Amino acid sequence: MSDSHLTAFDKASKAGFIIALGIVYGDIGTSPLYTMQSLVENQGGVNQVSESFILGSISLIIWTLTLITTIKYVLIALKADNHHEGGIFSLFTLVRKMSPWLIIPAMIGGATLLSDGALTPAVTVTSAIEGLKAVPGLSHIYQNQTNVIITTLVILIVLFGIQRFGTGFIGKIFGPVMFIWFSFLGVSGFFNTLGHLEIFKAINPYYALHLLFSPENHRGIFILGSIFLATTGAEALYSDLGHVGRGNIYVSWPFVKMCIVLSYCGQAAWILANKHSGIELNPFFASVPSQLRVYLVSLATLAAIIASQALISGSFTLVSEAMRLKIFPLFRVTYPGANLGQLYIPVINWILFAVTSCTVLAFRTSAHMEAAYGLAITITMLMTTILLKYYLIKKGTRPILAHLVMAFFALVEFIFFLASAIKFMHGGYAVVILALAIVFVMFIWHAGTRIVFKYVKSLNLNDYKEQIKQLRDDVCFDLYQTNVVYLSNRMQDHMIDRSILYSILDKRPKRAQVYWFVNVQVTDEPYTAKYKVDMVGTDYMVRVNLYLGFRMPQTVPRYLRTIVQDLMESGRLPKQEQEYTITPGRDVGDFRFVLIEERVSNARQLSNFERFIMHTKASIKHVTASPMRWFGLQYSEVTLEVVPLILSDILKLPIKELVPVEDSEA
């Protein structure tokens, strides 16, 4: 990558600053909506909190944001970019060659990030709409929680419904809206603290440590489950690195952190001033003058929608990366926006909608959702820490230092995990079950791919070159197609799957002018689009290796058209002049793509466990995108052929012929 690109990635700009606010900080920026409310309610209400409890809580929030978000993610993780892309799967691609078992933390981290992300739209939008309870004139309507639920569901239906059309048209307002949001957090928080400037003593970590062991803290270490809500968006910050660049995050994070901390301090000051008032409203909304609350709710709802949109888009990207890493089933992907970064996966969109809606209906209030929120993301952070340790070692950090630094973060995050574990019985089990289901699917898909690689036989193409030439010239067979294209997951040097040669020569001899053998390899770089060609010493057999980035669409026909033109222009491939055509000068014949589906046979080579893996993978395939759609072949001529997975050493079953009685008597 050139220095100019590196500079562009690392430098900041005014426009990049605003864009970063709209894309990166939606989740962490809406945490003030519910974090203090969770702390106060779990302590027994505003009447039950003391000054030392409030100081300790704010201190815990400040130092959690500092240690996890600022130091681990902004200062360390952002340096672990894979060609300017971030996130747990990008990090995995950087270190996967260091140890084969690293696929495990990558799968677990990706699954928990997806499952917790399904809860984010529910908790943020519900929290924002519940703010209407504090608005004079509307409070009598929204005191009925059913009205809150209905309004929330309507917003979610619209939000998930517009995904298919692309969100670029509304994405332009995300940055300015979030700038107003963060500015409001900072300004309102600052004015609320003016009457209680002692709240800024919370910057001293003494108050954080004191609260953890204080008898005033009714929940003990489990208070960290609520504190962790303040930093759940840190992982999303790293995942969105590629959208805005490292420099813009470096510049925007201090502003965001200052505004968030001021908001928490302002809410804390309001609690101290009203702890004997008996008010049980959400401190976030209650700390604002009543005449401004309707505007605040509107702004909070917009911020919640933006945060939800960021999580939805992030989920699409995460699943897309997992599919191209061959650890997730293939689902149909469309690109409704103007660039490749705006993708849409219908199945994932509606699964997220179903999970989010069920969460709203099952938990009903944001307080109940908060009780379940954050458990899975602690696991994601632990998995990221494991991968980061290997990255630091790979980049030359002394192993002892890498182990010590990451052990510190792992210890902190493990404590948060233990503190959040109590959430399992308060609804966290739903998120854990969803995460386990995703991990199971990933494991089945990955293990099934490895089994296929283990058993499928390969043959040397050179050994069958003469037979293919004879078939090509044999006019006794009708021309099957001018160009026959085979897509193969496995192709190394001149070795190709036995099933492909079986299809050409045995199953039904396929006479063609040119035989294409195409292998798509996903690279660690996100936007690679390169190819390599081997003519196998002929002008009628072409081996093509397509190297596509993990964020590139694998639409093979589009790439193949370019490759054909390049080969003809260079003289390596004869022109295929057409006698009958409506396109003057057309010199490329027709194409037929042959897809070979491998199914488990009854041969005995597979163990019972391997057979379970393959049968389960086959069942999952029924609800996934067909290879035809995945490779962009829906408008091409395609033949699907089924072959058994095991093609060697099939044992003969003993059987005897029954001789007719009259023949035996003769």
Swiss-Prot record:
SS bonds (residue pairs): none
Protein name: Probable potassium transport system protein Kup
Name of encoding gene: kup
Compartments where located: Cell membrane
GO terms for MF: potassium ion transmembrane transporter activity; symporter activity
HAMAP family: Kup
Source organism of the structure: Streptococcus pyogenes serotype M49 (strain NZ131)
InterPro entries: K+_transporter (IPR003855), K_trans_C (IPR053952), K_trans_N (IPR053951), Kup (IPR023051)
GO cellular component entries: plasma membrane
Membrane disposition: Multi-pass membrane protein
Family according to the record: Belongs to the HAK/KUP transporter (TC 2.A.72) family.
Superkingdom assignment: Bacteria
